[in-house]
């Protein structure tokens, strides 16, 4: 943390979400916000209510927003207890915010979650069991669903133009290997995260850093899996105000890092024929 960064732990006397202090967290959850509204409190309330007996810690990295500089902090101070808040001096983006958050965590397992997800009862233990099992994946994620229960994604891929396509076929309760999954909700062992090098801040401010991360995992012999028996609601596009950022710089970074993208990935026509859904047909993430 630089000298200009700010850090504090919330202590609301009447919290909507409370996380008990622990000296030995099993899972450290990292959340990156940027002018985020009340959805982050709803997410934290659902998280606090569903982690059960698992010792956890929560770190929120609040990137400064030019128009809403105090919005997230005010909400967290009012409605939470036991949440560590880190406020960097400048906007680090998603990747940089995640990495700053990781540096303030102690758990053996890292959970990266968006502020606009909602967790159901019983979601965490099955994902941890996958990481504890034989031949575990490097990354495990739930199926993301819309509020009406429609499958939003059970893993994703990119076509050769770098357009994202979501697998919307219901996997049932199966654990399926995927090319990558949205980092809206991931679990990964800290040792693996450190080994792979974490998220690349070159994808500032956001988008494609989860693709790059998962592709590095795959290049090094690891894999990403989605647990079909775990469904998490993702209020797509509600975590950050304003328009999504331009993707020109991030696309250039991805294509420079993975020049084989244009020749090895499937065509849009192939994915459409196989029943995948293009991100161009969906609201912003």
What are these regions (language model features)?
Residues 63, 98, 114-115:
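Short, structured coil/turn linkers that connect adjacent secondary-structure elements
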Residues 41-44, 48, 102, 128, ...:
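A structural alpha-helix within SAM-dependent methyltransferase catalytic domains
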Residues 33, 62, 141, 228:
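Short beta-strand/turn micro-motifs composed of small residues
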């Amino acid at each position: 943390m630089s000298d200009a960064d700010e850090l504090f732990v919330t202590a609301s006397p009447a919290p909507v979400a409370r996380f008990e202090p622990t000296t030995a967290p099993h899972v450290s959850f990292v959340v990156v916000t940027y002018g985020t509204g009340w959805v982050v409190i709803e997410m934290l309330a659902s998280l606090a209510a569903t982690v059960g007996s698992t010792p956890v810690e929560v770190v929120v990295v609040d990137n400064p927003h030019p128009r809403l500089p105090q919005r997230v902090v005010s909400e967290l101070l009012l409605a939470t207890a036991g949440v560590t808040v880190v406020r960097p001096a400048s906007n680090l983006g998603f990747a940089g915010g995640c990495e700053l958050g990781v540096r303030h965590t102690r758990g053996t397992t890292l959970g990266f979650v968006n502020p606009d997800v909602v967790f159901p009862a019983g979601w965490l233990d099955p994902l941890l069991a996958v990481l504890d099992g034989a031949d575990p994946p490097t990354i495990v994620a739930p199926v993301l669903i819309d509020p009406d229960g429609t499958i939003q994604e059970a893993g994703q891929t990119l076509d050769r133009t770098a357009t994202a396509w979501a697998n919307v076929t219901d996997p049932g309760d199966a654990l399926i290997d995927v090319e990558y999954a949205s980092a809206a909700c991931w679990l990964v062992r800290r040792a693996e995260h450190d080994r792979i090098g974490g998220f690349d801040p070159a994808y500032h401010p956001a988008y494609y850093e989860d693709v790059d991360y998962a592709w590095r995992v795959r290049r090094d012999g690891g894999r990403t899996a989605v647990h079909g028996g775990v469904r998490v609601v993702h209020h797509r596009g509600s975590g950050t105000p304003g328009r999504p950022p331009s993707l020109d710089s991030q696309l250039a970074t991805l294509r420079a890092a993975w020049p084989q993208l244009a020749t090895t990935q499937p065509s849009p026509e192939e994915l459409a024929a196989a029943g995948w859904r293009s991100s161009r047909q969906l609201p912003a993430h």
